[in-house]
């Protein structure tokens, strides 16, 4: 079990990444797209939760990892993917956890829990009012679920 921080290194909700990834008008995202950052410290402190990325090549694409199934504390199931890459000790690890195939599924879900209107920016105030600035991740013991995510208060 490990807490993934939703704030940046300055203690703020990023305006155009993380929970607000879709707020960046200069990239390929939609307004409510979001991801949960996985930092070097997260990987170094929990070797059982975050494994190096797998690379499998097919004729048309290279896939880093297969989709995973997560269950949130409220029972919501979501298909997600470990994405991006960061090198740690000579191996590549994911740098974020996103919903798939639609990146906005995670953003819309979190906004509903935070009572933030769709299309709007998530702020520190929203997280403070909710009572959490992190999401707890754990491996699941249920064979149909890969991970458990907890955002309960």
Residue map of PLM features:
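Hydrophobic, glycine-enriched assembly/anchoring segments
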Residues: 121-153
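Polyanion-binding interface signature
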Residues: 2-134
């Amino acid at each position: 079990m490990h807490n993934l921080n939703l704030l940046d290194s300055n203690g703020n909700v990023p305006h155009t990444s993380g929970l607000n990834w879709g707020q960046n008008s200069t990239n390929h995202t939609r307004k409510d797209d979001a991801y949960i950052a996985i930092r070097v410290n997260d990987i170094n402190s929990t070797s059982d939760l975050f494994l190096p990325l797998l690379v499998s090549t097919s004729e048309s694409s290279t896939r880093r990892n297969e989709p995973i199934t997560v269950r949130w504390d409220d029972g919501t199931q979501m298909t997600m993917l470990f994405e991006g890459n960061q090198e740690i000790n000579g191996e590549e690890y994911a740098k974020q956890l996103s919903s798939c195939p639609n990146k906005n599924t995670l953003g819309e879900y979190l906004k509903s829990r935070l009572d933030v209107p769709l299309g709007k920016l998530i702020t520190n105030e929203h997280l403070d009012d909710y009572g959490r600035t992190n999401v707890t991740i754990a491996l699941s013991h249920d064979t149909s679920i890969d991970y458990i995510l907890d955002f309960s208060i």
